[in-house]
Amino acid sequence: MADSLDEFIEEQKAKLAKDKAELESDPPYMEMKGKASEKLSENSKILISMAKENIPPSSQQQPKGPLGIEYGLSLPLGEDYEQKKHKLKEELRQDYRRYLTQGITQAKRKKNFLSTGETDPSTLGVSLPIDERLSAKERLKLERNREYNQFLRGKAESTEKVRQVEKNIEPKSQRNKNPISQGKSDLPLQIQTAYTHSEGPWLSRQEEGLYRQLDGEIELRSRRPLKQTKEEVGISGAEHPSLSGSAGVPERRARRANGERVLDRQHCRADRDPGVSEDMDERFRFESDFDRRLLRVYTNGRPHGSRRGYVDGDDVPEEPNTQISAAENKSVHCNGPPRSADLDITSPFAGMLFGGEDRELTKRRKEKYRQELLEQIAEQQKKKRREKDLAFGITTSGVQDPEKSPDRLKQFSLTPRHFEEMPPERPRVAFQTPPPPFSAPSSPSVPPVHSAPSHNEDLHSGLGSTLGELAHPRVLPVPLNPPPPPLLAPPASNYRTPYDDAYYFYGARNTLDPNIVYYGSGMIGGQPAPHVSAPVTHQVAPPAVNTVGQNEQKVLSDGLRNSGLVFEDKPKPSTQSLQSYQEALQEQIREREARRKKERLEKEEYEAKLEAEMRIYNPWGKGGGGAPLRDAKGNLITDLNRMHRQNIDAYHNPDARTYEDKRAVVSIDQNLATSNAENLEDSANKNSGPLQTQSSPFARGNTFGEPLSELQIKQQELYKNFLRFQIEEKRQREEAEREKLRVAEEKEEKRLAEQRARIQQEYEEEQERRREKEEEQRLKNEELIRLAEERRKEAERKKKEEEEKHNLQLQHYYERENIIGDETKHLRQPSPVVPALQNKIASKLQRPPSVDTIISSFIHESSMSRAQSPPVPARKNQLRAEEEKKNVIMELSEMRKQLRSEERRLQGRLLHLDSDDEIPMRKRERNPMDIFDMARHRVQAPVRRPSPKGLDATTFQNIHDFNELRERDSDTRVDLRLMYPDPPRDHHTLEIQQQALLREQQKRLNRIKMRRDAGADLDTICTDNAQGRRMPRDDTNDFLKNSLLESDSAFIGAYGETYPVIEDNAFPPPSQLPSARERRRNKLKGLDFDSSRLHTPQDGLSLKSISSVNVDQVRMRNEDRMRRLTEQQKKPTNTDDEGSLVDPDDIMRHLSDDGRNSAATEPWLRPGTSESLKRFMAEHLNEEQHKGPGKPGTFTWQGLSAAHA
């Protein structure tokens, strides 16, 4: 960062020198108009040159007085415009003060940042401060306005101070009053006035530029120790003895000029590096080639030569090999002026230095210069950025460079603007007058012949090398000794114009005109025109001249006389003073010639170095914005993270940032300060001899290997200390980062440990809950197993009780049979039966009869018995005994089936006790046969048993009750189990099996009613058949009337036929029965009453109806059936007497709301009906046992079950 700041300040220093040169060459007032003269085309320039021939040029020889004083081109203004001019100056002064007030505030802030090492907040994040971007025109306007305002202010202040001092020193100047008055009396009044007014612009501007430079140099010189001798400090008085005794010059002004002279000599002894002086601080010594070469464009028009007013006789043309810089020109002008006697013709006052500088005034000027320097810093950065954006090339190869276009400088205000016009010219007469004779005795001699080549050499060096290098290629060196143009007579004194001297001074010439040498001498203050337009570039300050001993009053008087400030009461300068100037000038020329020989060699080395640098020149400049990023060695930078860290470090430590300027052709040599340090020592010992030379201004680096200066060593130590500080800071930062990472890792480990502990705890709690759940499930399973075991034991106990009860009943039955058998022994034997009937009876004894067989045998026997005569009572008893034997065998067979069925049911319940399904699902192959055909053929049909999980509680309970009902042993239930071996699993299968059971029971009821209505002669057979089918043997008609099975609803047969309600009058009385022939015919036709069919839809259509699968309707029906059956069970029924058996029709009417109930609503179809009847018959059986085991006509459990079936 220190190197960056050094180079930045050095660039600003060079910029300041360039601005002062521009101020001297181009008037700010005209720059506000647009510098039209510099931007005109070639044709316009030619027209201007032709028009200027008619103007009385100041370059022509003007009439001289007896003292040889020349008068410039400037014409006097009219008396009428003096007030207006002063008013304009006052307004400009006020504007400048307002502008300066604002600039000082900003400059102080910037100075504070520079002095304290802080960074301007507006420039954070960038290498150099970047202010607002203004166009070139706006920047030039602002700059010219500021410079011109300063010029006017300085001019007014200088004039006022001179007048004040004049009053104080008027007695001392009386001795020189007469010669001056005599010299001036020979001149016309208007010339005297013009001469007086012509001093203002350039003299005031000279003083303003010098004290600005003085401020900056004194400020920089105060920062480091310098070896300054008395000889250097008092060089002004030694070199200008003729002015020491001059009268009418302000004392303060003399001290200021003296201080400026001291600084100028020190500055001119620098290493001739453009913009770099010996008194400059080390940080200002690094300047890019951009600034160095760009300054040359604006330094050719400086009027230093005209102000210093001398011509070197030893200044031989060097062709374009010599490169000129603005700072060198400044140093030449500062040191070279009073050396020869020919200065009386050119400008005797040029180069004069006055007495010592007031310290207080120096401090104020230093502060002012610092403020102006800060203002120039931002402007310089803008220009450099613009140069970079426009790819402005480095001007090192001259006019023959094929890579550079001739008009590349036009974009920097060197081309004419369409909205700007040529400046108006000063009014002049239309004819020329001959110059006045040079016959004055006090006129100085004509300069020697060698002085002209010296001037032409300087002019050629300024135009040929600098202008030819940067401006148009057609600008060539001018002749060495051009003939002077004709002189113009001064205009009439009464011709007044509204323009002031500065306007005509800057508006009457083109500073870039290649023919500027033909302007002649005497442009301003009697100086030759070439020195006004092209500065003398290679003059250097000579060593102190000790031979001059005149007093300061005399030197001041000569300076005022030669500069154009002619006072009528001032004495003329002495000849000795002029001679001293000529001798000093000759000494300076000899010293410069020796120095130039050395500079040629250094220049050749420098050009070789530049050629090498051009080969590696990077046109992109600084990396970024599309250009690759490179480090100081030219390597590509691809680590953007490292660059980011570097930028952060530079932000926090801006002073320690290493400067890397990639915008220059090559990287800057950091050893350049060594050469400057050596030059500083040379400047301290400058007075050792005239042949002592300075280091080359083109040396870029430690060319001769000089050791480092104390300041450089101190800077290196500071840099090393800062590097150590950075290393330590980085180490501490890394340590803090590691500590931070360690703390973060500890926190993370702690968090993970807590998380692991929490997860472990949750896992253990989950395991504990799982174990508790498993234990609870195990206990529940044990409880279920225990309950199942209890149920199994209870079922076994009940089964044993039932078996015991059944055995007891059998025992009672056998005892009763034995009793009956014993009784029948005493009866007579019946008559032999028909063999056919005997065979049929025997066949019946062989196997248990089926339902159809029993019915058919019943009808056949009924018809057979009708043909016989009614038997006697003894015969009835015998037939009853035979029938009872048959019934015993059938009962035993049915009991065996019941036991097997109960055993299978219990085993199934035990196996599937813990499962969800009451009975396991058995997958069977799908039988293509119709389910009703299978039922008719007694073929077992596969039934899909859905899981009871999807059933509601009511349907599940109904299925359970129906399963208990279908497991009872009866003919209808046996046939149902044959047709549907699997119990129902849903409401659909439940409905189907209920319909099948209804059909079987309906057929059974039909048979019972047929036997009831058969007649009196069939009572015995009907009774025997009823007992064979487990029906009550006594009073069948009364039992059927009181039976719970009788209903008013229609019943569906096995084949889908429906039977109407059986009314009491459905069967005719015995007297109205058909004859035996009709009954035999009906028997042969198979038109049995139970098989009679009506033309009704099939069972499939009825079972597949919507009503058959209505779950809610089935549930409501089953609930209604269970409720009615419960009410019926609460009413005791006695089967012994006929009064206890009520009419079945009355029972059905009592159980139903009306006679319109369907078969599905009958109480006998309810799932609990069979169990209820079972309990009812058990109670009745107990009553029989109490009455007596042998009483005939009692009901048995099987008989009632068969009757219910």
Curated annotation (Swiss-Prot):
<keyword id="KW-0597">Phosphoprotein</keyword>
<feature type="compositionally biased region" description="Basic and acidic residues">
    <location>
        <begin position="158"/>
        <end position="173"/>
    </location>
</feature>
<dbReference type="GO" id="GO:0051781">
    <property type="term" value="P:positive regulation of cell division"/>
</dbReference>
<feature type="modified residue" description="Phosphoserine">
    <location>
        <position position="850"/>
    </location>
</feature>
<feature type="compositionally biased region" description="Basic and acidic residues">
    <location>
        <begin position="1124"/>
        <end position="1134"/>
    </location>
</feature>
<feature type="compositionally biased region" description="Basic and acidic residues">
    <location>
        <begin position="417"/>
        <end position="428"/>
    </location>
</feature>
<feature type="coiled-coil region">
    <location>
        <begin position="874"/>
        <end position="911"/>
    </location>
</feature>
<feature type="compositionally biased region" description="Basic and acidic residues">
    <location>
        <begin position="401"/>
        <end position="410"/>
    </location>
</feature>
<keyword id="KW-0966">Cell projection</keyword>
<keyword id="KW-0493">Microtubule</keyword>
<feature type="compositionally biased region" description="Acidic residues">
    <location>
        <begin position="1135"/>
        <end position="1145"/>
    </location>
</feature>
<comment type="function">
    <text>May play a role in cell-cycle-dependent microtubule organization.</text>
</comment>
<feature type="region of interest" description="Disordered">
    <location>
        <begin position="222"/>
        <end position="277"/>
    </location>
</feature>
<dbReference type="GO" id="GO:0036064">
    <property type="term" value="C:ciliary basal body"/>
</dbReference>
<feature type="region of interest" description="Disordered">
    <location>
        <begin position="16"/>
        <end position="37"/>
    </location>
</feature>
<dbReference type="Pfam" id="PF24578">
    <property type="entry name" value="CSPP1_C"/>
</dbReference>
<feature type="region of interest" description="Disordered">
    <location>
        <begin position="158"/>
        <end position="187"/>
    </location>
</feature>
<keyword id="KW-0206">Cytoskeleton</keyword>
<feature type="compositionally biased region" description="Basic and acidic residues">
    <location>
        <begin position="222"/>
        <end position="233"/>
    </location>
</feature>
<dbReference type="GO" id="GO:0032467">
    <property type="term" value="P:positive regulation of cytokinesis"/>
</dbReference>
<comment type="subunit">
    <text>Interacts with PLEKHG6. Interacts with ARMC9, TOGARAM1, CCDC66, CEP104 and CEP290.</text>
</comment>
<feature type="coiled-coil region">
    <location>
        <begin position="87"/>
        <end position="108"/>
    </location>
</feature>
<feature type="region of interest" description="Disordered">
    <location>
        <begin position="1124"/>
        <end position="1169"/>
    </location>
</feature>
<feature type="coiled-coil region">
    <location>
        <begin position="724"/>
        <end position="813"/>
    </location>
</feature>
<dbReference type="GO" id="GO:0034451">
    <property type="term" value="C:centriolar satellite"/>
</dbReference>
<feature type="region of interest" description="Disordered">
    <location>
        <begin position="677"/>
        <end position="704"/>
    </location>
</feature>
<dbReference type="GO" id="GO:0005737">
    <property type="term" value="C:cytoplasm"/>
</dbReference>
<feature type="modified residue" description="Phosphoserine">
    <location>
        <position position="405"/>
    </location>
</feature>
<feature type="modified residue" description="Phosphoserine">
    <location>
        <position position="915"/>
    </location>
</feature>
<feature type="compositionally biased region" description="Polar residues">
    <location>
        <begin position="176"/>
        <end position="187"/>
    </location>
</feature>
<dbReference type="GO" id="GO:0005929">
    <property type="term" value="C:cilium"/>
</dbReference>
<feature type="coiled-coil region">
    <location>
        <begin position="357"/>
        <end position="391"/>
    </location>
</feature>
<feature type="compositionally biased region" description="Polar residues">
    <location>
        <begin position="685"/>
        <end position="697"/>
    </location>
</feature>
<feature type="region of interest" description="Disordered">
    <location>
        <begin position="380"/>
        <end position="467"/>
    </location>
</feature>
<feature type="compositionally biased region" description="Basic and acidic residues">
    <location>
        <begin position="257"/>
        <end position="275"/>
    </location>
</feature>
<dbReference type="GO" id="GO:0000922">
    <property type="term" value="C:spindle pole"/>
</dbReference>
<feature type="coiled-coil region">
    <location>
        <begin position="12"/>
        <end position="34"/>
    </location>
</feature>
<feature type="coiled-coil region">
    <location>
        <begin position="993"/>
        <end position="1014"/>
    </location>
</feature>
<dbReference type="GO" id="GO:0005813">
    <property type="term" value="C:centrosome"/>
</dbReference>
<feature type="coiled-coil region">
    <location>
        <begin position="574"/>
        <end position="618"/>
    </location>
</feature>
<keyword id="KW-0175">Coiled coil</keyword>
<dbReference type="GO" id="GO:0005874">
    <property type="term" value="C:microtubule"/>
</dbReference>
